């Protein structure tokens, strides 16, 4: 025979409310509370195989113990004095007295002492030597072998007597059945509370946000969201919770046990509810639907957070920036933006984040996990939202239309970001350089430039990138993959954005217009660079010669002059060029192709820029004016040469005689004089001349004679 060790006491299972909490209970809830407490006590007595004094137990069963009409009284005796403090509460014309928090603490302590005195007489069955322990919820914590097995639920117990008690609880009659859903209850009061769910009856309203509840206890718990009250503290770390259940869930974090494992991906969770919510990722199920906008969510928590979007009232305001929030927790998280606090740390790389969801997104970068696959093309995504947007690409569905230009978008956020292109709004500013962005995502990407962060490395060449998309585009250079094809001309591209921009060549669309001169461009970046022509800003400086440029592309092209790099080679003659456009124009010389024709005189040119310069001959336009003497020129090259006359600058020097010359053409003539070379040949007589000028003079004389 063994005695019960660490058996549960009545104080352990007692649900003790404070006076304020008790005042919030209505009549039906108080009756339900009474019945539950009495049943807990009966269960403990059955475990002990003894009972209290008959008068004491009947005293506990009387309703006046739980709901009194008069003021403070003293009544009853249980192994000593039990002080009963009565309180009158007026509600709807009736008086319903409530016993106080201190009263029940005293009663539960006395009942526990009485139970402790009975421990020595507790007898176990001879079935097993090891006792079991009963926790505060009257569930069984098994210690060793469990030979006795329940017939109904297959639950195992260490002792037959406890098994008998368990079977009694299992067989307890639930005589009150809901007509709507068939759910059964032991008490009629519990059934009445449950029926409010079907009727949609919500008697209790929140004064702050107007949310309605069908139970006053639910309202009380909800109000803690607005007040920030967290009465349940973790003894390990001191973290507070608004609900007792939240504390129970949190305590399992300290143990580290994750018994619930997903069969699909093997991910482990502390609670079964977390596993069920996670499994909806694989199934795609979203059972929680917003009544206002019909948007669906996987969890009720996400639905509740979404509901705040529709709430007009945002009572919690930030003192620093004035931004308002519907939840106090959201305000607390927002304050970290101002304080710079980042409480969520990545264990892989040590990076910290303000928001937990940002940490979750970041961790996927390390794991590379992409659990969401497109059935059409097999493409994988990290998030279900990414897959949802991608599916619309195959279906061609563009639900969201821009009212300005009629352009369609797959998501409302894309449309919202696009509309800023029309308004010019850039609400996201970089604190380092002051640059503005239309989207927060673009700002986050930009800030990596200041931090020098480039976490994505190419395995082929070792080059690093700040973004995964840039690495993906770069890898196509090595593989030669160009998955995006133009349906008009068949040209292929490595990026979808390049194809999108290229299509404007066929459509002639130039949506970006300069407000200064009216010139239009196919890309916003082209317009941005063009504006510097009017402002005169040249932010890109060459470190070799100090020359400034209005775009980084022009600077890169210029630097090839110093490095001598000419990566574009002509297969016909082997000549090299520093620009792709130059070799394209050069190839036309071999093919005698001159696609650009002057409408005035019919003269044709290999380059559009040549035609543009030639047309100034007909229009008389001379846009380049000398600030020194006021003389105007048709071309920038002649203007630059003319300015050397004023500055007395002679940059070109003959290597043979050391003579300094202003014009490159004069330098070439000088070098021909030194070498005796005659490169200009008359096609009629075959005579050669050192200079083109001499040949032109001869031809003019010949033409005049004829």
Curated annotation (Swiss-Prot):
ZnF bounds (C2H2-type): 176-198, 204-226, 232-254, 260-282, 288-310, 316-338, 344-366, 372-394, 400-422, 428-450, 456-478, 484-506, 512-534, 540-562, 568-590, 596-618, 624-646, 652-674
GO BP terms, alphabetized: regulation of transcription by RNA polymerase II
Superkingdom of this protein's organism: Eukaryota
InterPro entries referenced in this protein's UniProt entry, alphabetically: Ikaros_C2H2-ZF, KRAB, KRAB_dom_sf, Znf_C2H2_sf, Znf_C2H2_type
Molecular function per GO: DNA binding; zinc ion binding
Keywords noted in UniProt: DNA-binding, Isopeptide bond, Metal-binding, Nucleus, Repeat, Transcription, Transcription regulation, Ubl conjugation, Zinc, Zinc-finger
SMART domains: KRAB (SM00349), ZnF_C2H2 (SM00355)
Ranges of residues in domain KRAB: 8-78
Gene3D superfamilies: 6.10.140.140, Classic Zinc Finger
Localization, UniProt: Nucleus
Main localization, broad class: nucleus
Database matches in Pfam families: KRAB (PF01352), zf-C2H2 (PF00096)
GO CC entries: nucleus
Cross-link Glycyl lysine isopeptide (Lys-Gly) (interchain with G-Cter in SUMO2): where in chain: 61
Family according to the record: Belongs to the krueppel C2H2-type zinc-finger protein family.
Function recorded in the entry: May be involved in transcriptional regulation.
Protein name: Zinc finger protein 225
Organism, as annotated: Homo sapiens
Phylogenetic placement of the source organism: Eukaryota, Metazoa, Chordata, Craniata, Vertebrata
Originating gene: ZNF225
């Amino acid at each position: 025979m063994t005695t019960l060790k660490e058996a549960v006491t009545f104080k352990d299972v007692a649900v003790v409310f404070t006076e304020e909490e008790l005042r919030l209970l209505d009549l039906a809830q108080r009756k339900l509370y009474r019945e539950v407490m009495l049943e807990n006590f009966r269960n403990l007595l059955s475990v002990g195989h003894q009972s209290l004094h008959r008068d004491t137990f009947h005293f506990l069963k009387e309703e006046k113990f739980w709901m009194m009409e008069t003021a403070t009284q003293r009544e009853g005796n249980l192994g000593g004095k039990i002080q009963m403090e009565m309180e009158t509460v007026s509600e709807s014309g009736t008086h319903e007295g409530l016993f106080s928090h201190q009263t029940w603490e005293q009663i539960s302590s006395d009942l526990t002492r009485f139970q402790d005195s009975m421990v020595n007489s507790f007898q176990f069955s001879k079935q097993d030597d090891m006792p079991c322990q009963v926790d505060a919820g009257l569930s069984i914590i098994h210690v060793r072998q469990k030979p006795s097995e329940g017939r109904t639920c297959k639950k195992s117990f260490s002792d037959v007597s406890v098994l008998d008690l368990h079977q009694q609880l299992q067989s307890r009659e639930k005589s009150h059945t809901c007509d709507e859903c068939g759910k059964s209850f032991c008490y009629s009061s519990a059934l009445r509370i449950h029926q409010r769910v079907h009727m949609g009856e919500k008697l209790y309203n929140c004064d702050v946000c107007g949310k309605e509840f069908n139970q006053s206890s639910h309202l009380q718990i909800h109000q803690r969201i607005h007040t920030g009250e967290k009465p349940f503290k973790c003894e390990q770390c001191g973290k507070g919770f608004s609900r007792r259940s939240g504390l129970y869930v949190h305590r399992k974090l300290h143990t580290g046990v994750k018994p619930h494992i997903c069969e699909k991906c093997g991910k482990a969770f502390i609670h079964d509810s977390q596993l069920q919510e996670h499994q909806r990722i694989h199934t795609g199920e979203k059972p929680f639907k917003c009544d206002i906008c019909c948007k669906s969510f996987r969890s009720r928590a996400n639905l509740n957070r979404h509901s705040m979007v529709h709430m007009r009232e945002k009572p919690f305001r930030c003192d620093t920036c004035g931004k308002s929030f519907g939840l106090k927790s959201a305000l607390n998280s927002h304050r970290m933006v101002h304080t710079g606090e980042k409480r969520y740390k990545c264990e892989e790389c040590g990076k910290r984040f303000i928001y937990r969801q940002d940490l979750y997104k970041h961790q996927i970068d390390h794991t590379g996990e992409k659990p969401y696959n497109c059935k059409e093309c097999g493409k994988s995504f990290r998030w279900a939202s990414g897959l949802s947007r991608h599916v619309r690409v195959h279906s061609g569905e563009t639900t969201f239309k821009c009212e300005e230009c009629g352009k369609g978008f797959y998501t409302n956020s894309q449309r919202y970001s696009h509309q800023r292109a029309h308004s010019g709004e850039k609400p996201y500013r970089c604190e380092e350089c002051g640059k503005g962005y239309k989207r927060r995502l673009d700002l986050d990407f930009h800030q990596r430039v200041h931090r020098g962060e480039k976490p994505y490395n190419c395995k082929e060449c070792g080059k690093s990138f700040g973004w995964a998309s840039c690495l993906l585009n770069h890898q196509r250079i090595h593989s030669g993959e160009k998955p995006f094809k133009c349906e008009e001309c068949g040209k292929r591209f490595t990026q979808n954005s390049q194809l999108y921009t290229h299509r404007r060549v066929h459509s002639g669309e130039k949506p970006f217009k300069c407000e200064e001169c009216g010139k239009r461009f196919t890309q916003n970046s082209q317009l941005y660079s063009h504006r510097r022509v009017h402002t005169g800003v040249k932010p890109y400086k060459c470190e070799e010669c100090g020359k400034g440029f209005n775009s980084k592309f022009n600077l890169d092209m210029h630097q090839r002059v110093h490095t001598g790099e000419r990566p574009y080679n002509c297969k016909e003659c082997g000549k090299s060029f520093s620009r792709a456009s130059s070799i394209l124009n050069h190839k036309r010389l071999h093919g005698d192709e001159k696609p650009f024709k002057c409408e005035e005189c019919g003269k044709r040119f290999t380059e559009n820029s040549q035609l543009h310069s030639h047309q100034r001959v007909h229009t008389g336009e001379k846009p380049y004016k000398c600030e020194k003497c006021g003389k105007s020129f048709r071309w920038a090259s002649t203007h630059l040469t003319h300015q050397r006359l004023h500055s007395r600058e002679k940059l070109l020097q003959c290597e043979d005689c050391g003579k300094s010359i202003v014009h490159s053409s004069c330098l070439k003539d000088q070098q021909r004089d030194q070498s005796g070379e005659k490169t200009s040949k008359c096609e009629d007589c075959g005579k050669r001349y050192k200079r083109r000028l001499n040949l032109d003079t001869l031809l003019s004389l010949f033409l005049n004679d004829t």
